[in-house]
A protein has these predicted regions:
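A general structural signal for short secondary-structure junctions and capping/turn motifs
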Residues: 50-53, 91-93, 230-231, 332-335
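Non-transmembrane, aqueous-exposed alpha-helical and coiled segments at domain scale
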Residues: 251-254, 266-298, 304-353
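Short glycine/proline-rich, acidic loop/turn segments that cap or connect secondary-structure elements
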Residues: 349-367
Length: 395
């Protein structure tokens, strides 16, 4: 390994400008020597469960933070998040009759792609944007916003602590209830971190040991770029976010690069098009894919395409927009003889007020009072239950 960047910036978008490449080299060497965070068998088990969801025999519920904070990697907070996920999944199963695959946006969701590389404060100061705790800190100072490679080691440690807590929870409940595994997924954004944690699997291949399920974001899904090539190189189940700008040709290329008909749960397409775009754009993609559409798991992300700015200048989302996208997603798939495989939500385990119930409420100039997110707005526990219950009723 050299002190130069491992990846060409033009081929790997949304990568930090690290403060020291020499320190980055040392950090990556340290990560390469560490044990895997998850084992390959669990990743293979998740692939099989996603395959069942793709066939309509189960449903994936993925919920959790937009951007995890290191400070939340303590047993009390992790258990609260896991309990919320499992309650939502139980409610979904009770209503729909479908088994639920339970996956958190957890134990690795420490990095976020951003629309702009900088942020201008009210006094005119220009700072690097907050990119997640694995890169920098949200406090509005230059020191906090500096991208420090040492934070990758903190990401590994906090992810490990979180996964240990989840495993202890699952094992502790196994003797008292039907065992329900908590899988962990995150966006595989920081490619040097992800690559440093690639390990051999039992079949002679390689898997990303940073999490059970890894997805590529809508901003980094270019088929000829490094994020997609990384996803193609590992045996984990992987997802790709598909937004309204994704052409049918691009989606087809991604399916052929990342899909595997021998393993139907290998590829999930996570659709995030917004309530206005979901039916026409998804219909266009499905028509172009034809029979290939049946070889992937179709998951709805009804959050990211419906982010707005409210009258107080805060980013927010409306539950009625979220539900409209879910309804359009389900109807478009059914029109093509396909089954919805899952739902990805950004949720808080505390009673925050970051999303509103109706779009009309977004016009209010009064700031939402309990706004705690480090990045995007999350559903409160009440709102999450409402969305899950209404989705279950659709199915």
């Amino acid at each position: 390994m050299t002190a130069t960047r491992l990846l060409l910036p033009a081929r790997a978008l949304q990568q930090p400008e690290w403060a020291s490449l020499d320190e980055l080299k040392d950090v990556l060497l340290s990560l390469e020597a560490k044990p895997p965070l998850v084992d390959a068998t669990a990743c293979a088990d998740l692939t099989a469960e996603l395959g069942r969801a793709a066939r309509g025999e189960a449903f994936v519920l993925q919920a959790g933070e937009c951007a995890e904070r290191f400070a939340d990697a303590n047993p009390e907070t992790v258990l609260a998040k896991a309990d919320q996920l499992h309650r939502l999944a139980d409610e979904f199963t009770d209503t729909s009759g479908l088994p639920t695959v339970r996956m958190g946006r957890i134990a690795g969701q420490y990095a976020k792609p951003r629309s702009n590389p900088t942020e201008t404060l009210s006094d005119g100061t220009v700072l690097p944007v907050y990119r997640g705790d694995a890169v920098n800190a949200p406090e509005p100072t230059l020191a906090a916003r500096t991208a420090l490679p040492s934070r990758l080691l903190l990401a590994y440690r906090n992810a490990g602590n979180t996964l240990s807590t989840l495993l202890e929870r699952d094992l502790g409940l196994a003797g008292r209830t039907a065992p329900q595994r908590t899988y962990a997924g995150h966006e595989a954004l920081l490619l040097e971190y992800e690559q440093a944690l690639v390990r051999p699997d039992a079949d002679g291949g390689r898997y990303g040991s940073s999490g059970h399920f890894l997805w590529i974001g809508d901003r980094t899904r270019q088929p000829d770029h490094q994020h997609v090539q990384f996803a193609a190189s590992v045996s984990n189940p992987v997802g790709v976010k598909i937004g309204p700008r994704a052409s049918a040709e691009e989606v087809g290329t991604l399916v052929r690069m990342l899909g595997d008909r021998r393993r139907p749960g290998r590829l999930s397409l996570i659709v995030r098009m917004g309530r206005e775009n979901i039916v026409p754009h998804l219909t266009s993609v499905l028509r172009a894919l034809g029979d290939e559409a049946a070889g992937v798991a179709w998951i709805c992300d009804p959050m990211h395409g419906n982010t707005r700015t409210n009258g107080a200048g805060q980013k927010s989302r409306a539950v009625d927009d979220v539900m409209a996208e879910i309804e359009g997603f389900v109807s478009a798939l059914r029109a093509h003889g396909l089954r919805p495989a899952g739902l990805m939500l950004e949720t808080a385990h505390r009673p925050v007020t970051e999303c509103v119930d109706t779009a009309a409420e977004l016009a209010s100039p009064t700031p939402l009072p309990h706004y705690e997110s480090a990045c995007d707005p999350r559903l409160s526990p009440r709102q999450a239950r409402q969305v899950v219950a209404r989705t279950a009723a659709l199915l």
